């Protein structure tokens, strides 16, 4: 079985989309890669809907200006990714790889 935390899957998908956006650097995606990108877009859509982040977003929209601008100074209350990553790596059977095959029946990780 493969085991990984969903956060690593999200980061993988964001990186895949980033690479597709910079085709001039990474090359055009193949048909198989485009199918993978569709999967990534849907996975991130599901994450956004499931997590339903309620952080208020402030916009600047002067009168008669057709261009609404997002003010990027909003604060999120987040988990500390460095601590999540440290926790996951301490329990990994994969020596730093975020996804690996685990032998069936083998004990994985430790206490939560």
Curated annotation (Swiss-Prot):
As for what it does, the entry says: UstYa family oxidase, part of the gene cluster that mediates the biosynthesis of the secondary metabolite victorin, the molecular basis for Victoria blight of oats. Within the pathway, vicYb catalyzes the oxidative cyclization of the core peptide. The pathway starts with the processing of the precursor vicA1 by several endopeptidases including kexin proteases as well as the cluster-specific S28 family peptidases vicPa and vicPb to produce 7 identical copies of the hexapeptide Gly-Leu-Lys-Leu-Ala-Phe.
Question: According to its UniProt record, in which pathway does this protein act?
Answer: Mycotoxin biosynthesis
Residue stretches spanning the membrane = none
Q: Which UniProt keywords apply?
A: Oxidoreductase, Virulence
GO BP, one annotated term: mycotoxin biosynthetic process
Q: Does the keyword Oxidoreductase belong to this entry?
A: yes
Q: Does the keyword Oxidoreductase apply?
A: yes
Q: What is its EC number?
A: 1.-.-.-
Q: What is the lineage of its organism?
A: Eukaryota, Fungi, Dikarya, Ascomycota, Pezizomycotina
Q: Which family does it belong to?
A: Belongs to the ustYa family.
One function term, GO molecular function aspect: oxidoreductase activity
Kindly state the positions of the motif HXXHC 1 in this protein: 9-13
How does gene deletion manifest? Impairs the production of victorin or of any victorin derivative or intermediate.
**Which top EC class applies here?**
oxidoreductase
Protein name (record): UstYa family oxidase VicYb
Name the source organism: Bipolaris victoriae (strain FI3)
Q: Fill in the domain comment.
A: The 2 HXXHC motifs are conserved in ustYa family proteins and might form active sites.
Q: Where is this motif: HXXHC 2?
A: 36-40
- Give the highest taxon in the source lineage: Eukaryota
Pfam families given for it? UstYa (PF11807)
Q: Fetch the InterPro entries from UniProt.
A: UstYa-like
């Amino acid at each position: 079985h493969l085991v990984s935390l969903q956060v690593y899957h999200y980061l993988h998908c964001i990186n895949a989309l980033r690479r597709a956006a910079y085709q001039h650097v990474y090359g055009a995606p193949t048909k198989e890669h485009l199918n993978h990108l569709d999967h990534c877009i849907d996975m991130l859509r599901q994450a956004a809907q499931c997590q339903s982040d309620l952080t208020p977003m402030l916009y600047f929209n002067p009168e008669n200006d057709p261009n609404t601008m997002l003010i990027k100074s909003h604060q999120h209350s987040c988990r500390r990714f460095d601590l999540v990553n440290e926790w996951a790596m301490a329990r990994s059977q994969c020596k730093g790889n975020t996804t690996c095959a685990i032998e069936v029946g083998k004990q994985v990780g430790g206490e939560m």
